[in-house]
Amino acid sequence: MPAMVGFLLTAVGLPLLTLVAVARGSAGQGSSGWTAMTRYLPTWAATALAIAIYIIMGPAFATPRTGLVAYEMGLKPWLGEAGQHGLLLYSLCFFALVILVSLDRGRLLDAVGKYLTPALMVMLLILALGVIIAPQGGMPEASGDYIDTPLIKGMLEGYNTMDTLASLMFGALIIGLLQRKGIEDYPSQFKYLTIAGLISAVGLSAVYISLFYLGNSAAGVVTNVDNGGAIVNAYVLSLFGHYGQLILAAIITLACFTSAVGLLCASADYFHGLAGWTYRKWVLLMGCVSILVANVGLSQLISLSIPVLVAIYPVAIALVLVTFVQSYFGRPRMAFRAVLLVVFLFGCLDGLGAAGMQMKAFAFLPLFDKGLAWLLPTLLTCGLGMLLRPREALAAEAA
């Protein structure tokens, strides 16, 4: 239970707060969500952070992972021992279609998303009810950090969803879309983003809780697997047979496909606006890179992404935090930059530790062994920022 709570905090709670923060940061600024949220940062720092997020959500991790999840849950179960050899061919076909749709965005993507989302939710509801009514196995034995620090372990595992980074990326895009549609006032923008966040939070919570329950009743159903997709596949096969497994494969494949198109389009749009290349060239480049990255395999990609996410996620969390409390800073520009600098430095230490580097010199830091060395210094810096007095007040006292 503590692990599930920790996971939901970072995989559901933080994305919801992030969407609200994007709307709050845009209040009265007359600019897009990202520009408004990072207005106290140097332009180069805000741009570097945006580039890092779009690369992570684009060709480096999130987009290739959609193809890998589709492969693991959509095709590999039907290939048996030949599954590993089919990854290259599958990724070529999958991302070729993603590139084609991304090059010509239109009604196709809207139609697929419109009908796919309800179908996916119905399928997940059926799976959740099946797991509750007819669990297929027993509860597996907890091990490692799931015994010692389950709450923190759950929080760190929630990083892997990348949902907070996605909320920063798509929240800013939604603000821009609302502004283009003539919705300029803050109350309306706040309302729409909050409603969207609440709907997604409820849906994600239902999905994650049902998957937690599935994992807690999977002992004996499957053995010797190295990722969650294989567990879900084996469970569905045991619960519904090959027909249910086929339906799950089709829906997951389509869901991953539309996610890949959305991520690729958003990333290409951003870099098109940032650099001189055309949108189509960016789509082709990022699609090809996604093919290469996807062929490392799902488990390996997740392992490679963990140190990066451990380093960058605290920065995103701190950005959301200071967006809510910046009105309490006596010198908002100074405090804002100090908080982000501190969290970046300590987040990098956590990331290096997660990568397996020897970091004994920093073992004295509170929560360093838990991957949360950034937490206390960030909160302390934020508190000090609230104690700073405005220049005007100091000048008045001096006079």
Show where each model-derived region lies:
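Hydrophobic transmembrane alpha-helices that form the core helical bundles
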Residues: W44-G80, C256-H272
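Hydrophobic, membrane-embedded alpha-helices of multi-pass small-molecule transporters
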Residues: G130-G137, D145-L211, I247-C256, L341-G351, ...
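C-terminal membrane-solvent junction of multi-pass transporters and transport-like membrane proteins
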Residues: V320-G383, L394-A399
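Hydrophobic alpha-helical segments and their helix-loop junctions in multi-pass secondary transporters
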Residues: P59, M121-Y146, T164-L165, Y213-G215, ...
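Membrane-interface loop-to-helix entry segments
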Residues: V101-V131, I306-I317, A338-V343
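Selective recognition of specific alpha-helical transmembrane segments in multi-pass small-molecule
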Residues: L9, G13, L17, A119-V131, ...
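Membrane-water interface regions at transmembrane-helix termini and the short interhelical loops
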Residues: A27, F95-L116, R180-I183, L292-L304, ...
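TM-loop-TM module centered on a large, flexible mid-protein loop between adjacent transmembrane helices
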Residues: S32-R39, V207-F257, G273, P307-L309
